[in-house]
Design a protein with these regions (language model features):
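Short, acidic/polar
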Residues: 12-24, 67-75, 136-146, 191-198
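Hydrophobic faces of well-ordered beta-strands that scaffold small-molecule active sites
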Residues: 3-9, 31-33, 56-60, 84-86, ...
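Conserved anion-binding
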Residues: 2, 68-72, 77-153, 158-161, ...
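Glycine-rich phosphate-binding active-site loops on the catalytic face of alpha/beta enzymes
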Residues: 79-91, 189-222
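Active-site-adjacent beta->alpha loops and helix N-cap segments on the catalytic face
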Residues: 14-16, 36-52, 64-71, 88-111, ...
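Structural motif
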Residues: 26, 52, 79, 150, ...
Length: 238
């Protein structure tokens, strides 16, 4: 299965996004568009990035009643995105409805993945704030099995849980993993993190990397380093 690095373009405007991507010239990295940018610029930012040749992960984390999730995904399916997501906590029925809404009349659709637990969450937070008295591994894999049962393509989890997900759901079930930082970088507000090489060795199919690339002195060099470490599993010292 092909692996890739997805750049989290967590900018507040189209201008900032285009200025950043212009640094890559003819390279067309896979990009993630999140709530901040999508809510600021609307669907046109997605259309323009597709015209520019980028693959897009639209990260809106839909979590609503099944009917609303279905109708929302029906709208998103018209944007020619490559991947989008829902919250696994929305239940199996919601995920099934979202998948149905995302599927176009010709049977094609973007990849649909489910968010398990955000990488800013740890077990203490789950217990105190969410009243979930289980280990992170148990919670994430339970959500992953629900997503598989609903027919989804994979889950968002930390790279620390990727191997557990593959053990239960198979190698073809995708693990899309934020919480990736360089060994010499700052972890920021992330609590469950690995390096690109560690993520690859633990089974991540896609890694989502934001600030270590977007805030780097040389974003292109940082991106290439990330790709090299992820695809070569750390064999290159860059």
């Amino acid at each position: 299965m092909a692996k890739d690095v997805i750049i989290a373009c967590d900018f507040s405007s189209a201008k900032d996004t285009f200025d950043f991507l212009d640094k890559f010239q003819d390279e067309k990295p896979f990009v993630k568009i999140g709530m901040e940018l999508f809510y600021a610029e609307g669907p046109e930012i997605v259309r323009e990035l597709k015209r520019m040749g980028h693959k897009i992960f639209l990260d809106l984390k839909i979590h609503d009643i099944p009917n609303t999730a279905k109708k929302t995904m029906s709208v998103l399916s018209g944007l020619d995105i490559d991947m989008t997501n829902v919250h696994a906590a929305g239940t199996v029925n919601m995920m099934k409805a979202a998948l149905e809404g995302l599927t176009r009349p010709d049977g094609t659709r973007p990849l649909l993945i489910a968010v398990t637990q955000l990488t800013s969450t740890d077990e203490e937070t789950m217990k105190k704030d969410l009243l979930i008295d289980k280990t992170m591994e148990v919670v994430v894999t339970h959500y992953a099995m629900n997503a598989e049962r609903a027919g989804l393509d994979g889950v968002v989890c930390s790279p620390k849980e990727a191997s557990y997900v593959h053990d239960l759901c198979g190698d073809s079930f995708l693990t899309v993993t934020p919480g990736v930082r360089f060994a010499d970088g700052d972890t920021g507000d992330q609590k469950r993190v690995m390096t690109p090489a560690e993520a690859a060795k633990n089974g991540s199919d896609y890694i989502v990397v934001g600030r270590p690339i977007t805030e780097a002195a040389d974003p292109v060099a940082a991106y290439r380093r990330c790709v090299r470490e992820f695809l070569n599993q750390g064999e290159s010292n860059g």
